[in-house]
Structures are given as C-alpha cells and as structure tokens.
Amino acid sequence: MESCSVTRLECSGAISAHCSLHLPGSSDSPASASQIAGTTDAIWNEQEKAELFTDKFCQVCGVMLQFESQRISHYEGEKHAQNVSFYFQMHGEQNEVPGKKMKMHVENFQVHRYEGVDKNKFCDLCNMMFSSPLIAQSHYVGKVHAKKLKQLMEEHDQASPSGFQPEMAFSMRTYVCHICSIAFTSLDMFRSHMQGSEHQIKESIVINLVKNSRKTQDSYQNECADYINVQKARGLEAKTCFRKMEESSLETRRYREVVDSRPRHRMFEQRLPFETFRTYAAPYNISQAMEKQLPHSKKTYDSFQDELEDYIKVQKARGLDPKTCFRKMRENSVDTHGYREMVDSGPRSRMCEQRFSHEASQTYQRPYHISPVESQLPQWLPTHSKRTYDSFQDELEDYIKVQKARGLEPKTCFRKIGDSSVETHRNREMVDVRPRHRMLEQKLPCETFQTYSGPYSISQVVENQLPHCLPAHDSKQRLDSISYCQLTRDCFPEKPVPLSLNQQENNSGSYSVESEVYKHLSSENNTADHQAGHKRKHQKRKRHLEEGKERPEKEQSKHKRKKSYEDTDLDKDKSIRQRKREEDRVKVSSGKLKHRKKKKSHDVPSEKEERKHRKEKKKSVEERTEEEMLWDESILGF
C-alpha cells in the first residue's frame, strides 16, 4: 500500500524531496521510478510533474486512463517505470552536446518501443506483422525499414533541442490493424485488440486464404469461388461480372468466326480452280484448310443442325444462355442471296445471249434454261438451284416449298414486280413498233409487205430486232390483245356520245376536222371501217333528237292540265316575264353563235363544209329555242 500511495502521489505531482526515505529498499519498479524522481527533483519542480502525470492521461507513456483500476495498474507497472526512467535520463542530459543527445534519444526510443513488443512478430516503426523470425530479420535489413529510420532521424534533426519532446511524439503515434481496419492511439489498446478473439478469427481466415491462393486453380469455377470467399471475409462485395462477360464475348466471337469463315471459304473456292473443292459437296461443310486455322473446330459436323445442337449443349453446361439468332439470320441472308442471284442471272444471261452470235443463241431454245453465265456461278449455292426448270412457274413453286419447309415466309414479290415491269416495257415496245412499221412500209416498196395481209401485223424485220428473251406465248397473247383493242376501237367511238344538243354543236366541228385528218393519215384499207363508224354516230344523234322531241310533247300535255287550275291574273304576269326572258336569251344565243362562227371559220378548210355546218346549226338553234321555251314553261308551271 505504501508503494501504491507513493506512486499515486508521485504521478499526481505531490511528491516531496523526502519521499525516498519512506520507501523500502526493494528493487521494485515504482521505487526505482520514485528514486529517479527524487534525484531529479532539483531539476523538475512539482508543477511540471503534475503536468506529466494526471489522473486521466500519462504523457510519458501516452496512455488514456479512464478508470481508477487502470490508473493503479498502469502507474504500478514495469513499463511505466521504464518510460519514466528513460524520460528523466533524457532530460537530465539536456545540457550536453545536442547532436549526441539526439542520436542517443532516437536509439533509446526505438529500443524502448521494441522492448514491449517482440521484434520477430511486429515492427512498431513500420507497423508490420511477421509470421517467422526470418521474415522479420529480412525486414529489418531491408530498404523499407532503413528508409523509415532515416526519415525519423531527419525529423528529429530539423527540430530544435529545446523544443524536442519525445513524449509528444510517442503520444501522437497511431497503431493500425489492417485486417480489421481499426486504428489505435495507444500501444496497450492495440495489443489487447491483437489478442482478442475477433481479430484472431479474421487473422486465421486470411492466413488460410493466403495459403490456398498459392496453389494453381484447376478451373475458373474454383478460382471464382475462392475469390468470392476472400471478398466476403473482407466484408466487400464480390464482383464476378467481368470474367463472365469475357467468357460470353469469347464464345460469341469464336462462333462468329465459324459463321464468318464460311463466306470466306466460298470466296476462296471462287478464286481457286473448281477441281480442288469437288470433294466437299455439302453447302455447309467447312474445308480442312479453314478448320486447321480455327483453334476450337476440332470436330467436323455433317450439317449445321448438329453443330448448333452441340453449341447449345456447351452453353447450357456452362450456365449461359445460348444465342442462336446470329446463325439463323446468316442462313436466311445466304438463301435469299442465292435465289436473288438466280433471278438476276436471267436478264444478265439474256443480255449475253444477245451479244453472242445468232447461232449460239439458237442452241438455247427454252427461255428459262440456265445459260453459260449461270453455269459459271459458284458451287456453294443450294443443291435445288442446280435444277433446270421448263418455266418460271415451276421454279417459283419449288422455291416456295423450300421456304415453307424451313419455316420462312416465301417472298414472291421481287420476281412478280420484275415481270410486270418487263411486260409493260414489252407492250410499249410493241405499240411503239407499229408507227415505225408503218413508216417503214411507206418508205419501202409495197412488195416487201405483201405476205402480211393484216393491217396491224409486225414484219419479221422488226421482230428480229426485238430481244430474244420474249417467249412465244407472250407474243401470241400480245397479238391477240392488239386485235381485241382494234375491235373495241371500231365498235366504240374514241370520244363519248354527247347527251345534250349543246355538246353536239360544240363537238360537231371537231368531229369533222378529225375525220378529215384521219382520212389523210389512214390507208385505203381502213376507209370502210371508219365510214361504218360515222354512220353509227349519225344514227345515234338522230335517236337523241327524236327523244328530245317526244319529251316536250309529253310535258306540254301535263302543263295544259295544270293551266286549267290556275288563276288568270297569275297567267298574265308569268307570260310577261316569260317573254322578257326569252328575248334576252335569244340575244345572248345570237351573240354566242356569231362568236362561234368566227372561230369555226378559221378551222374549216373548205367552203362546202362551212355551208353544211351553218345549215345544221340553224336547225339546231331553232330546235333549241323551242326546247328552251318548253323547258321554261315546265319550270314556271304553265
């Protein structure tokens, strides 16, 4: 109890010069500390001691003292006595040479710090732990530890001797546990944490993981599981997406190389002679030269279906979603490309046939047989494209069956549009040939065309100039359509028949002019047909005139019945209004007739025709006025 009271008095700053007399002559650490304090009492007064040793903090050791039991155990301990003796030794030699004192302080300070902790397990300066004495020894000899010592020496050299306080430097030191990520300001707290159960568990986990990480991983799955366990032990979220994405990208890249190698292989087949590739009949087999270049294509597949099934199994075994869309699109594009080449090869081959001699073109009588240009197409086209078809209909039906068997919708519009455009183009050529043919008939003697009695038949000279791709049945259909059009032209007039008398008057002059021009342009063989057509027109006009006369007679009978029921006063007023309107209309009609006569005088080529038209117009004007009068009576209610 005496030693405890002495140490407490000593730490509180109430110790006196005669305290050493009451202490027993033992070699305990508190006694030695009090003796050191007694010897240095002349240098250090009580106020300075009170500042160093307080009830809550020991500045010499840099330890926080929260409870009374902590204060008692700390001040009675050997570590506190060593720190106090070291502190008073340093301050007792304050009047000596500064350089020597600084060097001695650094060495003693390091020794003091290493005395508390085993050097083979922990380096207080570098804050590093060691699992064996050999590793610790190599660390102390190494550059890192030497560099830290040098930095500490430089910091102490820069500071002034009077301002240097080792207890402050010691108190500012922090201790960090990198496994638990915790920092401590005191060495005792750090030691207690290192000896705790929580730290020991984490340390054992980390050591086991480090030992296991040295062995080589048999597969990526084991490596990934190891990595996840380490991250979970550290309390971090494991990131497993980067390796998975890499695998998927590699897989898709490899299978795309397989897909892309096929068109390259076909291009290679086109460049090299055909004999080198006759052994590969199937369109989807890859040649041995290309398979050797691919790193993973060790297996040869009889068809794409087997290869796709193998790929799906591999992807499912790896836990990935098999992507089967890129290969399907590729097949569709290849098929449509093949059929389009077959369709496009037709016009090209026909153009080439026109450029060849006539004897060479005679050997290809059927229009849909494969031409020499089609025989030069690459051999990687589907097997059904090698067949010869008698007509395009058979070829189209075969194509539709193939597309339906593959589960695709057959596209038949591209050939249909081309046919319609070709047909219209051919019809225009046939129509355009007729005036040219007639011009040739006018220029050439008549003897050359005696064999063709029909007026619209085409000569062999013009037929030879047409392209050879026209089928025989097409020409027959066109001739039949032309003859049908001629019959319809003869049966029906080129312009509709007018319904009213005004339209008849307006169109009579144009009909006469057109008839004369048509007579000059047409040949002698067509005169009879046109005369018959004019007779029919005149008969229709007469019918319309008779119907116009019958209508007003019926209307007059109806209006006479109505007159008997009306008043006489109203009759007088209406008759006066009717006469005024009739006079105005007669004036307007006479002015219009004069204007029309002037216009038609310029158009009529001869005087005889003018006289005929005047007579017809006078009759029509009289009929028109009577008709208008009857029409007005019917409207006004007479």
Curated annotation (Swiss-Prot):
Subcellular location: Nucleus
UniProt biased composition (Basic and acidic residues): 544-556, 571-587
Pfam family, one: zf-met
Region: Disordered, residue numbers: 496-638
InterPro entries named in the record: Matrin/U1-like-C_Znf_C2H2 (IPR003604), Znf_C2H2_sf (IPR036236), Znf_C2H2_type (IPR013087)
Keywords carried by this UniProt record: DNA-binding, Metal-binding, Nucleus, Repeat, Zinc, Zinc-finger
GO molecular function, one term: zinc ion binding
GO cellular component: nucleus
ZnF (Matrin-type) residues: 56-86, 121-151, 172-206
Bias-annotated ranges (Basic residues): 533-543, 592-601
Extent of Polar residues compositional bias: 500-513
Name recorded for this polypeptide: Zinc finger matrin-type protein 1
UniProt organism field: Homo sapiens (Human)
